[in-house]
From Swiss-Prot:
It holds the Pfam family F-box. SUPFAM superfamilies: F-box domain (SSF81383). InterPro entries: F-box-assoc_dom_typ1, F-box-assoc_interact_dom, F-box-like_dom_sf, F-box_dom, SCF_F-box_component. Coiled coil: none annotated. Residues 4-50 form the F-box domain. This is Putative F-box protein At3g21130. PANTHER family: BNACNNG10540D PROTEIN, F-BOX PROTEIN CPR30-LIKE.
Length: 367
């Protein structure tokens, strides 16, 4: 006689408690299995517990042919050989709500903050997107978006409210000024208007995108009409909705074209790379007054224009492009390796790499 199987049904609260310890990438795979799992992944209770208890993963994404891809960059040392690879492991699918056939959106630029992607499209639209939960919010402008606009996504550290910064450089005024607006997710509207004078963010490579660290965004900027070495670190504080000028390491003068920014794992620390001397500096302490303590982390014996930090300081691995807009990468560990990204098209290029930390954070709710 066959024994009857005893089916154990877990309460939804217990399921949420269990899943709050599972990585966001693993939970994202559950969305396609059933409507119930899809709804649970988007549940506010799970999002809050997951933020507190789940392991955080630092991954890499890249923009290729207007699509966002996950990239696996591996550099492992064995006894007799080094195992290294850079492969595209998956594509994030962002459907266009204006398309009857739900075609995918053509993405121009991507900005990452705490698991959310702020994407500007080639037809000048703006969307905030969580690839893990599939949640999106299309942001309507007060006035039409422009190709020249600069965008950043962050959050208020006091209220945990998401916000978007939009900057528009007004070149028809003398002196040149940068007008900016701030979108508040709680009110679902553009609430702040301001003008920032005396600064300039050149349109050079990927430097114009800025980087998010603990909710705030940082750029390398120049003093308006100043010499090329009159450079400073510009911060937009989403708690005060204002700009701050911060200090850079001052031991070696260099021009704007010789410096780039990156972040360590999970957007915890800001990094500055100086191609003149090939030095990597890490911001170890940031004061509200604008002062920053910098520590020199690494020095390389070759010239690099822009670098992405992919590993922590205990086992440093750095990646940079062999040539701009190419699919050839340098991987730097104990030695230098040049590899080609394994991708679907030999003609496709990797314009830049971004550190991406998946999460279940909800766009409509607080972080």
């Amino acid at each position: 006689m066959m024994k009857k199987r005893n089916t154990v049904y877990l309460s939804e609260d217990l399921i949420v408690e269990i899943l709050s310890r599972v990585s966001a990438v693993s939970l994202a795979r559950l969305r396609t299995t059933s409507k119930r799992w899809n709804a649970l992944v988007k549940d506010e209770r799970l999002a809050k517990k997951h933020s507190a208890y789940a392991p955080r993963q630092s991954l890499v994404i890249t923009l290729i042919d207007s699509r966002v891809y996950l990239m696996n960059v591996s550099l492992q040392y064995g006894i007799e050989k080094v195992d290294l690879s850079a492969k595209l492991t998956g594509q994030f699918s962002l459907k266009d709500p204006l398309s009857n056939s739900l075609e995918e959106v053509d993405i121009r630029n991507v900005f990452h903050c705490d698991g959310l992607l702020l994407c500007s499209t080639k037809d000048n639209r703006l969307v905030v997107w969580n690839p893990c939960s599939g949640e999106t919010r299309w942001i309507q402008p007060r006035s039409s978006y422009k190709v020249s606009d600069i965008y950043a996504l962050g959050y208020d550290n006091t209220s945990s409210c998401h916000k978007i910064l939009r900057m528009d450089r007004s070149e028809d005024r003398i002196p040149i000024q940068t007008e900016y607006q701030v979108y508040d997710f709680t009110s679902k509207s553009w609430l702040v208007d301001g003008v920032a004078g005396g600064l300039f963010i050149p349109s050079i490579g990927t430097r114009r995108r800025g980087l998010s660290v603990k909710g705030n965004t940082y750029w390398l900027a120049l003093t308006e009409d100043g010499p090329p070495f009159d450079m400073f670190l510009l911060c937009f504080d989403f708690s005060t909705d204002g700009f701050r000028r911060l200090s850079l390491p001052t031991d070696t003068p260099c021009t704007y074209y010789d410096v780039s920014l990156s972040v360590t794992r999970e957007e915890q620390q800001l990094c500055m790379f100086k191609s003149h001397g090939s030095e990597l500096w890490i911001a170890t302490k940031m004061e509200s007054t604008g002062a920053i303590s910098w520590s020199k982390s690494h020095r390389f014996h070759f010239r690099i224009d822009e670098m992405t930090v992919l590993a922590d300081q205990e086992k440093p691995v750095f990646v940079y492009r062999f040539k701009p807009k190419s699919n050839m990468l340098h991987i730097v560990g104990e030695h230098i390796y040049i590899i080609q990204v394994d991708q679907h098209s030999a003609d496709s290029k990797c314009p830049y790499l971004l550190t991406y930390v998946p999460s279940l954070v909800q766009i409509q709710q607080s972080i």
